[in-house]
């Protein structure tokens, strides 16, 4: 895989209703004690649309998206019509979100879903910690809550590092999402035992 030219952006949200505005959209809870957190924005069908970093500033909310695939500003503008807020968008330096950024993320075991095909991803398959199931309504909330409480999640998305150069023969129920350098991002059956991957497949979980 080659990392295509990313589209990193920053959006600043101003206005008295900025907290309520973003709280009703994101999967995480901006009312927590943290001044900085990660979250997803989902489709109504509960699939990942954006992964964002949220920073609470004195007079605004800073939203950072490492690779804006679906026009985050237009998405916010659609929901902002009835809110007392204003939006400002800035392009970020692409050099900070290229191959080195992506490789460092994989080494740390972090999957930046902004570089994956969003339309097929359930958020709980990747970073379940980006979802607060107690916070109340947000876009896609009914779907992800049903998956959680009825234990309907069947897959996990994990990072593995190749420990040899042997030809890789993955089982049929493994889905390769990304192969980058010596790293693979795989979607696997949830309860699969991967402790023997080193000897059987030459893969080590990151």
Pin down the residues of each PLM region.
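Basic, glycine/lysine-rich polyanion-binding surfaces/domains
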Residues: 1-206
